[in-house]
């Protein structure tokens, strides 16, 4: 299907959808969007913050840290990765000073793209999919958000998880906040959602976003 004036419509969609936003969802919970290719959720605990995803680069992670300090006056004590894609983990290095626990879930089946041949194919597909060879004027956006920091030479600062769960569901109380972490494979085999029952807040990672299909 061909779309008339497709670039203009994409530009209008991007301008309407991907402005930097720090939205208070409810008391003690903020949704941060428009800072990159992914979002982050700040959950304020008794003495520290629980952070769901870390954005895609060290530079953007540092900006997120300044927002967290501004909103809460607290440091990050726990990071939860909703899944292993780099745009959700690339900012983790910005939070090392507070020595956070970092939680992730293990994939249930083998991650095939880690094999040599498929990794090369995946990398080439990603280069085309996200328009890394395009200028800002040509790219407009990456569909589900502004361009990743990598497109501007920003450093990804991955930090391995300190706790990896193999279960399908884990419930924990962290900093006085009850968190239900549930495995729900989507873009990846390790994808989880995080439900905060007391706040009635669901952190769904890339299992749901306002752009379909993600081309």
Predicted regions and their residues:
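Core dinuclear metal-dependent hydrolase active-site scaffold
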Residues: 164-196, 201, 208
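Active-site metal-binding motif and surrounding structural segment of the metallo-beta-lactamase
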Residues: 17, 25, 47-48, 59-106, ...
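Metallo-beta-lactamase
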Residues: 111-182
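Conserved beta-strand hairpin/beta-sheet module of binuclear metal-dependent hydrolase folds
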Residues: 19-70, 193-206
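N-terminal pre-domain segments of enzymes
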Residues: 1-19
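Short catalytic-loop micro-motif centered on adjacent basic/acidic residues
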Residues: 31, 50-53, 77-81, 180-181
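Active-site environment of divalent metal-dependent phosphoester hydrolases
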Residues: 59, 84-90, 109-112, 188-190, ...
């Amino acid at each position: 299907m061909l779309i008339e004036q497709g670039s203009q419509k994409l530009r209008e969609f991007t301008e309407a959808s991907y402005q930097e936003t720090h939205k208070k969802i409810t008391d003690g919970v903020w949704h941060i969007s428009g800072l990159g290719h992914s979002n982050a959720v700040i959950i304020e605990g008794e003495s520290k913050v629980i952070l769901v995803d870390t954005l895609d680069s060290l530079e953007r992670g540092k900006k997120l840290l300044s927002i967290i300090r501004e909103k809460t006056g607290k440091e990050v004590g726990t990071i939860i990765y909703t899944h292993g894609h780099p745009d959700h983990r690339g900012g983790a290095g910005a939070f090392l000073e507070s020595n956070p626990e970092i939680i992730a879930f293990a994939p249930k089946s083998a991650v095939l793209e880690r094999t040599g041949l498929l990794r090369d194919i995946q990398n080439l597909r990603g280069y085309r999919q996200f328009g890394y060879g395009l200028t800002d004027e040509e790219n407009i956006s990456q569909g589900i958000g502004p361009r990743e920091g990598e497109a501007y030479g920003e450093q990804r600062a991955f930090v391995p998880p300190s706790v990896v769960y193999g279960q399908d569901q884990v419930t924990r109380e962290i900093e006085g906040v009850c968190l239900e972490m549930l495995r729900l494979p989507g873009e990846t085999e390790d994808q989880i959602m995080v439900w905060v029952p007391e706040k009635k807040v669901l952190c769904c990672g890339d299992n749901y976003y306002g752009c379909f299909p993600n081309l």
